[in-house]
Amino acid sequence: MSHMTPQEIVHELDKHIIGQEAAKRSVAIALRNRWRRQQVGEPLRHEITPKNILMIGPTGVGKTEIARRLARLADAPFIKIEATKFTEVGYVGRDVDSIIRDLVESAIKQAREHEIRKNKPLAEDRAEERILDALLPSARDSGFDANPSEENNATRQKFRKKLREGELDDKEIDIEITMSQASMEIFAPPGMEELTSQIQGMFQNMGASKKKSRKLRIREARKLLTEEEAARLINDEELKLNAVQNVEQNGIVFLDEIDKITSRSEVSSSDISRQGVQRDLLPLVEGTTISTKYGMIRTDHILFIASGAFHLAKPSDLIPELQGRFPIRVELDSLSADDFKQILTNTDACLIRQYQALLKTEGIELNFSEDAIERLAEIAFSVNEITENIGARRLHTVMEKLLEDISFNATRYSGSTHVIDAAYVDERLGKLSQSEDLARYVL
């Protein structure tokens, strides 16, 4: 679990997301409260439940980006899912219980990667010993714990030095590698993912891994042997137990597009299904027990963050019980022309820096003047005003159209420097941005 303070979390989010201070603060406090709860003693700790968050705002203002960046900062089991993927039990489609199953799978994968990183130094040492055994088969008795004979020790150390310096990387050796059986893929019918997963696991357990001798270059052999030794060092039962506990205590679920499962004033059969999804979500958000192949998972302390544009619906269109499960509501603001300018220049991976890096691979130096950046921001903002407001995503469309000629003829322009100024921006985009019809279909 991340030990970052709310200020540190907001500072990290500021590197990638412009504005939306209220949303960043709410998410930062919620993430910090996960850590605070762990410091509280029992039985009070069990009574402290997370305060779920509902983020409301138009498309393209940073709701999903906050979730993506939060996933990297959280250092906890995290899953982002679209609410529209799920249907009421009895309808064709995925049921909401699969959210928790997917979260557990994510936690298992995360825990395995963490263990592999932790065991890598020891795994590399073991892989090195196996390569030396293959190079000097008589220098060692069988088994890792056996000591090399005194007379061959000097030779072994010489080979070890050459191996570490990369002098033997292209030499071929015969090594035994554990070959896992090819996994049998079973396509799950809607609503039967858990049963299919159990059947697939049964078939995998039936096929035992076999050892196979292969002739490989030392460079390739080292990589394969390190992976094999790292996997051997993992205690699978302990890993699964810790991952399940981590999900129950620190898991975070990001429910995107929750406004798409709201019911509107006019009732239709699809609205009934949407209400069913909301009712199915209720016990999950409130706290229930879900059966998975790794055991029973309690959802009482899993944090749920929901988001939606709420263009055609209002948060009050959610069923009252579900509204009550998201006590913290945050409204995200529409982006201004100044916000667009900051998005173009002030984030760590801003669009201008991305396009400069892409075209540099073709030998093209791309420079943007200050007035060009301001003009791009103005055009993106005005097109959003006169057509559909798609937020920061409009900048991608504008930048692609602006640099279309340079990107297409990159080989011809190789070795040159291009300065993008306001005049060039107007030449490429001026007419398009001024005509509502052209802007609607081109930008």
Curated annotation (Swiss-Prot):
List the transmembrane segments.
none
Q: Name one Pfam family in it.
A: AAA_2
Question: Where is this protein localized, as stated in its record?
Answer: Cytoplasm
Asked whether the keyword Chaperone is assigned, the reply is yes
GO terms of biological process kind: protein unfolding; proteolysis involved in protein catabolic process
Q: Where is this region: Disordered?
A: 139-161
Query: Keywords in UniProt for this one?
Result: ATP-binding, Chaperone, Cytoplasm, Nucleotide-binding, Stress response
Q: Cross-referenced SUPFAM superfamilies, in alphabetical order?
A: P-loop containing nucleoside triphosphate hydrolases
- Show the Gene3D superfamilies listed in the entry: 1.10.8.60, DNA helicase RuvA subunit, C-terminal domain, P-loop containing nucleotide triphosphate hydrolases
Family assignment from sequence similarity: Belongs to the ClpX chaperone family. HslU subfamily.
Purpose: ATPase subunit of a proteasome-like degradation complex; this subunit has chaperone activity. The binding of ATP and its subsequent hydrolysis by HslU are essential for unfolding of protein substrates subsequently hydrolyzed by HslV. HslU recognizes the N-terminal part of its protein substrates and unfolds these before they are guided to HslV for hydrolysis.
Stored NCBIfam families: hslU (TIGR00390), PRK05201.1 (NF003544)
Full protein name: ATP-dependent protease ATPase subunit HslU
Say which species the protein is native to.
Answer: Nitrosomonas eutropha (strain DSM 101675 / C91 / Nm57)
Which gene name belongs to this protein?
Answer: hslU
